[in-house]
Amino acid sequence: MNRLALYCRQGFEKECAAEITAKAAELEVFGFARVKDNSGYVLFECYQPDDADRLAKEIPFRELIFARQILVVGELLRDLPPEDRVSPIVGMLIGVVDRGGELRVEVPDTNESKELLKFCRKLTVPLRTAMREQKVLMARENKTRPVVHVFFIAPGCCYVGYSFSNNNSPFYMGIPRLKFPSDAPSRSTLKLEEAFHVFIPADEWDERLASGMHAVDLGACPGGWTYQLVQRSMMVHAVDNGPMAPSLMDTGQVTHHRADGFRYEPSSSKIYWLVCDMVEKPAKVTSLMIQWLVKGWCREAIFNLKLPMKKRYEEVSQNLLAIKEALDTAGISSEIHAKQLYHDREEVTVHVRRMWSAVAGRRDERD
């Protein structure tokens, strides 16, 4: 098995391919990407044996922007016999995966694959049973062991492989299953909820998404992102010239500032979170976020960058580099991650966390 399969949003295959090619080259691993437009996945074939396994271990999954999942796979299994689809799949894994912890039978996230998904659900139980008999899977699920993937791209055609549980998406098909809250002002609320799941470790939520924190939402109207902050009992400064949902204002947790998000400056020194989902050029939003972070107006920020039609990977990379260089120049240590979330469209979501100041006398923690 010497290739990677990467799941991605339909229509973003070229960006996913450019990214994995660049990341592999950084590790001096070379190969070529196979891209089929609107397929929802990318294949990266390595030139040297065992390089795919190395990449799946050594490229930090959380640093991949456009990939929803990364796994090692072998040759495409074609024309699986209808009378016995299980045996060829299991046979390909014997000697490759020993006592995997979980089985996921998946498809690309496309409209064309929806019918195929129903078949995958039916196949999962007999596959799991056969894999346990052959010791490909453990008798019980184990979250610390490799995950076995069977990835159907068409009826009777699938890739078979594995991912590492400490360097993959924990979600089936790489998609967190979130339910839209009926009282939320807009569906955009799911973007921020997903961002919390992707960027903030679950065991740090009580500390970093704590009740009583102060937050600012730039371009807040009608309040989809503010809703998530209010649900976590934060005090929110919502900045927008447009109206906010009355249900949010009635909580007493929201202060509405009728102002331009690009001109607003906080009067409070207690702001921990900054969130922003404004429809504007990526460079302009990036410049605004740099201002907030360098001036210490917030400790963590989550914001969206709307993408152009062309050179989207390059655009994102340039803006992330601009943030890093600005913070480095200011002597501020930081963590910077970006992801095209399931609930994103022509955009990516960025998370920046100020860690500490490298300059003597500069304060990072706000009073």
From Swiss-Prot:
Record's function text: Catalyzes the 2'-O-methylation at nucleotide C2498 in 23S rRNA.
Keywords of this entry: Cytoplasm, Methyltransferase, rRNA processing, S-adenosyl-L-methionine, Transferase
Record-linked Gene3D superfamilies: 3.30.2300.20, 3.30.70.2810, Vaccinia Virus protein VP39
Annotated source species: Serratia proteamaculans (strain 568)
Record's catalysed reaction(s): cytidine(2498) in 23S rRNA + S-adenosyl-L-methionine = 2'-O-methylcytidine(2498) in 23S rRNA + S-adenosyl-L-homocysteine + H(+)
Spans traversing the lipid bilayer: none
Keyword rRNA processing attributed: yes
Active-site positions on this chain: K306
GO molecular function: S-adenosylmethionine-dependent methyltransferase activity
EC number: 2.1.1.186
One BP annotation, GO: rRNA processing
Matches recorded under SUPFAM superfamilies: S-adenosyl-L-methionine-dependent methyltransferases
Residue ranges the record marks as coiled coil: none
Residues given in the record as S-adenosyl-L-methionine binding sites: S188, C221, P222, G223, G224, D240, D260, D277
Pfam family, one: RLMM_N
Name recorded for this polypeptide: Ribosomal RNA large subunit methyltransferase M
Any GO CC annotation of this UniProt entry: cytoplasm
Quaternary structure annotation from Swiss-Prot or TrEMBL: Monomer.
